[in-house]
Amino acid sequence: MQIFPAIDLKNGQCVRLFQGDFSKKMIVNEDPIAQAKAFATGGATYLHIVDLDGALEGRPVNLEIIQKMKEAATVPVQVGGGIRSLAQVDYYLDSGIDRVIIGSAALTNPDFLHAAVQKYGPKIAVGIDAKNGYVATSGWLEVSQVNYLDLAKQMEKVGVETIIYTDISRDGTLTGPNLEQMAALQKHVNIHLIASGGVSSRADLEALSQLGLYGAIAGKALYNGHISMSDVTEVENHAY
């Protein structure tokens, strides 16, 4: 299972949120370029970067920093946050980003998503963020009436190859991932699934790996030492 150390960017710094609440923001490193390099030096093989400013503004804000992070880390990176047009997708992928994550726009602008998938195939991932099983949009500020399983099925039909599923109620809480929802997703669609939110220990990563998932994202647990980079590399290389 691929494990993605997460770097969330706000005002040019690495931060962590609690349940997606921008008012509950904690700065974990003032230098995101150094953080990206540290994860890669520690053995990370793929980074997950979120432009939180971009998610709020609906356009990429931290492009320059993200490019420098990619250069410093020299490992593949996937980026999300505020990507709502094909021109923005083009810009990221043309600048060397390996995969872009389309969030709210997958629900609100299906034509854009379809065009992106047609053009770039596996370089497009969709982020499904849900609260109590219902999809949230606009930087998690609004909750729709769309069930996460229905949206995942819809994405599969469009040709999306990777879904990143975040249970907002677990994000940044260190309470463990929602294994039940991930198992339901795994049964519902036949595409790459990446679990996000709540990972608090090596045991959580092992449990997600045992579900047969393609990947998992680790954030706060890496920053506070609950998970080490050696845990990441060992779980990543173990067949469960």
UniProtKB/Swiss-Prot annotation:
Enzyme Commission designation: 5.3.1.16
Active site: D8 (proton acceptor), D129 (proton donor)
Cell location: Cytoplasm
Keyword rRNA-binding: no
InterPro entries in the record: Aldolase_TIM, His_biosynth, HisA_bact_arch, Isoase_HisA-like, Isoase_HisA-like_bact, RibuloseP-bd_barrel
Catalytic activity line of the entry: 1-(5-phospho-beta-D-ribosyl)-5-[(5-phospho-beta-D-ribosylamino)methylideneamino]imidazole-4-carboxamide = 5-[(5-phospho-1-deoxy-D-ribulos-1-ylimino)methylamino]-1-(5-phospho-beta-D-ribosyl)imidazole-4-carboxamide
Enzyme class: isomerase
Pathway(s) the chain acts in: Amino-acid biosynthesis; L-histidine biosynthesis; L-histidine from 5-phospho-alpha-D-ribose 1-diphosphate: step 4/9
Gene Ontology terms: cellular component: cytoplasm
Main subcellular location of this protein, as a coarse class: cytoplasm
HAMAP family: HisA
Family, per entry: Belongs to the HisA/HisF family.
Protein's recorded name: 1-(5-phosphoribosyl)-5-[(5-phosphoribosylamino)methylideneamino] imidazole-4-carboxamide isomerase
